[in-house]
Amino acid sequence: MKASRFFIGTLKEAPADAEIVSHKLMVRAGMIRRVAGGIYNYLPVGLRSIRKVEAIVREEMNRAGAIELLMPAVQPAELWQESGRWEQYGPELLRFKDRKDNDFVIGPTHEEVVTDIARNQIKSYRQMPVNFYQIQTKFRDEIRPRFGVMRGREFIMKDAYSFDKDAAGLNESYRKMYDAYVRIFTRLGLEFRAVAADSGSIGGNFSHEFHVIADTGEDAIAYCPTSEFAANVEAAEALPLIAERAAPAEAMEKVATPGKAKCEAVAELLSIPLERTIKSIVLATDNEGAEPTIWLVMLRGDHDLNEIKASKLPGLKNHRFATEQEIVEWFGTPPGYLGPVGTKKPVKVIADRTVANMSDFVVGANEVDYHIAGVNWGRDLPEPEVADVRNVKKGDPSPDGKGVIDICRGIEVGHVFQLGTKYSEAMGATFLDESGKPQPMLMGCYGVGITRILGAAIEQNFDDKGIIWPESIAPFEVVLCPMGYDRSDMVRETADKLYAELVAAGIDVILDDRGERPGVMFADWELIGVPHRLVIGERGLKEGKIEYQGRRDAEATLLPADTAAAAVAEKIRAALAH
């Protein structure tokens, strides 16, 4: 590629609405341009990287035995009504009517459509396992699109769907996709972790998220540095921090805590560790035609409620936070002084695992400006219902018993689910088993955010000059920067020769023949993030040398002109192999 025949749309300044590094750099590097909120044009530089991501994903999906197809972006409402998601999905599902007043959606995902394909095409167990995938543009009507391609409304995604006759087959399909994702993100040159996760709105029982590690990541990941354990904080098991409950050592006592409604303030006033205080959170579940059920969830003062875990407890699936009016009615006091001792009306108490093993702890007295110290289970309170209802913290024991938890930030770029029969039962996708009886197909679904990967890669790979692409997804692998291409025969002939040698070696190279000043050339390609640069100048050529600099290198080095192309090609091959 010659730069004079390519479109390079770099900018010196980022738009005012760009909040994070990847959004700023993608605009400045000429990769994207905004059309509407969360909707972008992908300019030539950006599209080249997209196509490289797609190629790696496609190769690994094919290698894993998945079969490519293409489903429509526009889907009839009837399919979503069959699955039940027409009512469940919410305003993120873009709905519209055609001229005949029929309801349609723009697909944010394709479980319904692919299940419709399967129920019409798969009739026997002999036709399974099968795994269909596509790479396609999708639309999710985010309430607040931001961060460029990281939280856009329109995006490119690879989604795959497996169909199996039994649980063993589903497990095998899932394993193949999990392994394929590990290969994909390794080939993309990204630091990533696969974490156990909650299945969210897709549904299903078992899932993993793939996160690119970045300080700007939206998701908190709990992992163990000395083992393979990793999980989304929302899904990570929180073990009790006290192995065995100690015998009571204090008498229960009501203490004045004027104006101290927070655990931290109470601990400071009473000169006790925060870990001896209890945080009381009030949840409610509604009962048709009757007053709500009120739940008191007890956490250690330094711990936080995990709502996803709470929602999975019996009776709490559709919980909400209690209103202040309800709290006063049941406890006799506003929030800040709540506790399980002496409530006005009966409540259901759930203690986190750590709280269940505590002794001599401090709770609210259900009276403004008062708490109760020296509280103990069995003596002052009945034994509680015990459950894991908190988020893990740094320093907690790892659930696998092989170390302690650390926390990092991650950007979700892939997700794999075991759906089971959620969609096949709802939509009647059955097959005849070995005995001729109809059975629901077992499904898995597997997504990769193609455009989101670009943003995540940049969040992990940048400096004050611009993007630093891994070789595998850089728009170009090498840029040739000739000094005086239009003025010096020696420079032009050498640059053209290097270009031809690199092309012949299968290297993705661009020759900057625009005639720009060196400073402009260097700034453009550093901003765009090309991993390797060769500078051809008369002074160096007279000594038989060409200047080489990797995008991550602090200093340039000199290479023999006659072997420079081969040397750079070898660097690229080594990087891709690694």
UniProtKB/Swiss-Prot annotation:
Q: Which InterPro entries match?
A: aa-tRNA-synt_IIb, aa-tRNA-synth_II, aa-tRNA-synth_II/BPL/LPL, Anticodon-bd, Anticodon-bd_dom_sf, Pro-tRNA-ligase_IIa, Pro-tRNA-synth_IIa_bac-type, Pro-tRNA-Synthase_IIa_type1
- Molecular function (GO) terms listed? aminoacyl-tRNA deacylase activity; ATP binding; proline-tRNA ligase activity
> Its GO CC terms?
cytosol
- Catalyzed reactions: tRNA(Pro) + L-proline + ATP = L-prolyl-tRNA(Pro) + AMP + diphosphate
Where in or outside the cell is it found?
A: Cytoplasm
Q: What is its main location?
A: cytoplasm
UniProt KW keywords: Aminoacyl-tRNA synthetase, ATP-binding, Cytoplasm, Ligase, Nucleotide-binding, Protein biosynthesis
Q: What is its EC number?
A: 6.1.1.15
Q: Which Gene3D superfamilies match?
A: Anticodon-binding domain, Bira Bifunctional Protein, Domain 2, YbaK/aminoacyl-tRNA synthetase-associated domain
Biological processes per GO annotation: prolyl-tRNA aminoacylation
User: Superkingdom of this entry's organism?
Assistant: Bacteria
Q: Which Pfam families match?
A: HGTP_anticodon (PF03129), tRNA-synt_2b (PF00587), tRNA_edit (PF04073)
Kindly indicate whether the keyword Coiled coil belongs to this entry. Answer: no
Q: What class of enzyme is it?
A: ligase
Question: What does the comment on domains in this protein's record state?
Answer: Consists of three domains: the N-terminal catalytic domain, the editing domain and the C-terminal anticodon-binding domain.
Purpose of the protein: Catalyzes the attachment of proline to tRNA(Pro) in a two-step reaction: proline is first activated by ATP to form Pro-AMP and then transferred to the acceptor end of tRNA(Pro). As ProRS can inadvertently accommodate and process non-cognate amino acids such as alanine and cysteine, to avoid such errors it has two additional distinct editing activities against alanine. One activity is designated as 'pretransfer' editing and involves the tRNA(Pro)-independent hydrolysis of activated Ala-AMP.
Assembly, per entry: Homodimer.
Report the sequence similarity comment from the record: Belongs to the class-II aminoacyl-tRNA synthetase family. ProS type 1 subfamily.
Per its record, how is this protein called by name? Answer: Proline--tRNA ligase
Naturally occurring in which organism (per UniProt): Burkholderia orbicola (strain AU 1054)
The gene from which this protein is expressed is proS
